[in-house]
Amino acid sequence: MNIYEDIAKRTQGDIYIGVVGPVRTGKSTFIRKFMETLVLPNIDNEFKRDRTRDEIPQSGSGKTIMTVEPKFVPADGVVIELKDAVSLKVRMVDCVGYIVDGALGHEENGKQRLVSTPWSKDAMTFEEAAEIGTKKVIRDHSTIGVVVITDGSVTGIERGNYIEAEERVIDELKSIQKPFVVVLNSMTPKEEKTELLRKVCRSVEENHLCYF
C-alpha cells in the first residue's frame, strides 16, 4: 500500500489539508497554487468551478497580514485523482498563523487590534484570535498538515523572526502525531543559502519532507 492509498483508507477518502505556519510565509499562495493545479481542473461543472475559484483566498506580497480567520476552501470537497487511481475528496483549511515580529496589520496606532470571534462573547486581540484559530486548524480541522515556512525573501521580514513560530507549529503537530510536510517558500530557491536552509530543515525534521 502506498502513501496515497493509506491516506484514503484512513480518512474514508475525505481529507482536510491544514495549511499552517507563521503569518506572512505564503500559506494563502500555496492554497491558490494547489487549487489552480489540482482542484479546479477536476471540477466539471462550469458554475461550480467559477464559484470555487471565487472562494480562493487572496494573497499578496509584503509584510501586511492578509488572512483574518480560518477558512475552508472550497466550501464543498472536490474529488481529485492521485497516483495509482487513488481518489480523495479534498478541502484546504487556511489560517492566520502565529504572529511574528515585523508583520503588519495586527496593531493599530501602536495597540493590538480588538476583534470579535465565535470563540468568545468578548472582543479579544487579533493575536489571541490568530492563535486560537491556528490551533483549531492544527488540532481539530485538519487530517494532515502543510507547514509553510520562508527564508524571508518573499516578505522582507528577517528569517530569524520566523523561527520560534515555526517551531511552535511543528511541535504541536508532533505532539498530536499528525502527519505533515514542510514547504519552504523562497524567491531564490537556487541560491546556496536557500539550499542550506532546506538541508537544515530536512535534518531537523528527519521524519518529514521539506519541499521548495
Predicted features by range, described:
Residues 1-121, 139:
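Conserved G1/Walker A P-loop phosphate-binding module
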Residues 13, 28-33, 163, 167, ...:
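Conserved structured core elements
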Residues 17, 91-93, 143-147, 181-183, ...:
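Hydrophobic/aromatic beta-strand patches that form the interior of the parallel beta-sheet core
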Residues 71-76, 161-165, 173:
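Short, motif-level signal for alpha-helix interfacial/capping segments enriched in acidic residues
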Residues 81-86, 137-141, 172-176, 202:
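Conserved catalytic network of the ASCE P-loop NTPase/AAA+ motor domain
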Residues 101-106, 157-160, 193:
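Short, conserved acidic/polar surface loops in the N-terminal third of protein domains
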Residues 113-164, 181, 187-191:
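Conserved Switch II/interswitch segment of TRAFAC-class P-loop GTPases
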Residues 168-181, 186-212:
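Canonical P-loop GTPase G-domain recognition
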